Amino acid sequence: MPETPSTPKTTYTVIFDANGGNGTIASISVEEGSEFTLPENTFTKTGYSFAGWATYADGNVSYSDKAKITVTGNTTLYAKWTAITYTITYEPNGGTNADGNPAGYTSGTETITLLAPSRQYFDFGGWYTDSEFSDSSKKNEITKGSTGNIMLYAKWTVAAENAVNAINSLPTGEHKIAVTGQMTKEKLNGVIAAIKGNSNGAKVYLDLGGTAIDFYDWQRCKFADCENLIGIVIPAIESPDKNNPIILIPDLMFEGCKNLKTVIILNSSGEYKIITFKDCTSLEYVEIPTSIVCIHGDAFDGCTALETITYKGTVEKWKQVKTDFKDSKYKLMSLNVQCENGTASGFDLIKE
């Protein structure tokens, strides 16, 4: 008898749909009744994790990734997605966070407007994703469609008239205090006294860059022996003499500030001299503007931690700065100088 021809097996096509995701997965052909393993998912969707496969776009998950299945007809499998919950971490920097600020979000969350924290005596300056508060990192809201865990830092300023109370309230630790507004001799000396006398021994980086102060009021302030001062930004101060360099940092102004690590001098109108930061043994970073045209030879004697100063001008401009003593025994002469277009040294200064 002739052999009965075998009946060919029916094959079905399985199609994979990203269901709002991105990428492609090739369709496959399978024989009716045969078990096969689903290919590994390679679809992606920003802000979502892959949850498995469904047989309807809005259906529940029927199969996990790489599951073994059989089909009874042509089939489309739809990727199912679970929104990732991202964390929002707040560093209020001494303040108290607002109750309404959420701890997390998903990419589908409606835009979140961040609420201001509170802090007695201080003014809130915004939330930032950078602890150094670069302008580009300021964040007022988290827009819908955002992804990723977020760390937010509160920036604070304090008005000059509130600075003493603000400093008195500081707990143990290191604190950067950015003061704004009109500063007077009386206010600044009060600030210095508060730093010296903080009952918790708080260490203060005093940023006066946002203040305005009269030159003579500035010169009548003494930071000497302020052991709790760890940094200072000296504001732009208008010179009362446009024709001659005058002294910006007089003798003894910072004497005994043995924990002072950072000094940044902002550029001012007019020309200035620096007399001394002698014996500031912890001083590590000094930033000098082009308005400084003369530095005393012994200005940094005893600053044993200082190796390099930063000059906010060119090498050529630095070499026009004058000094009264040019001798290798002075610390200034041995310092490296980082300029905008290269490096120089203290010994490049012109002897007056």
Where do the protein language model's features map onto the residues?
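Structural signature of tandem-repeat unit edges
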Residues: 104-106, 177-183, 201-215, 227-248, ...
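Extracellular/surface-exposed low-complexity segments
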Residues: 126-128, 156-158, 318, 322-352
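Secondary-structure capping and domain/repeat boundary segments
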Residues: 1-158, 351
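Beta-solenoid repeat scaffold
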Residues: 148, 190-206
